Amino acid sequence: MAFILPDLPYAHDALAEFGMSAETLEYHHDLHHNAYVVNGNKLIAGTEWESKSLEDIIIGTYDAKAVAQNGIFNNASQHWNHMQFWEMMGPGKSAMPSELEAALILSLIHI
């Protein structure tokens, strides 16, 4: 399944009051995140991963531990990370979602 760059859920200047300028968001979303999308799509083209979901690509390429697939894993996982990043930040958001907080605490207990 092709990677698709999601629209930001807010305007590029929406985080200026928190110190993230419109220019920073434009660069980070429109160029940096988009590079993971473009490169990921190039890497999965014509492979077994082309028809898989993003989550299946991440899990499958991580589990495979294949050197040739490291680029696929990196681009897929960074695309996923950035999608979460955009959703978790935004005007009016200040607290960590309770599900994420619980998962983080649980994961730290097992370290």
Where are the language model's segments positioned?
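Acidic, low-complexity proline/glycine-rich segments
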Residues: 1-12
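Alpha-helical scaffold segments that form or flank carboxylate-/histidine-based iron centers
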Residues: 18-32, 54-80
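Aromatic-residue-lined binding/catalytic grooves and analogous aromatic/hydrophobic interfacial grooves
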Residues: 38, 42
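Surface-exposed patches in mature extracellular/periplasmic domains of secreted proteins
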Residues: 47-55
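Extracellular zinc-dependent metalloprotease catalytic-domain scaffold
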Residues: 72, 97-100
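Membrane-interface helix-loop-helix modules in multi-pass inner-membrane proteins
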Residues: 75, 88-93
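Conserved small/polar residues in nucleotide/adenosyl-binding loops
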Residues: 109-111
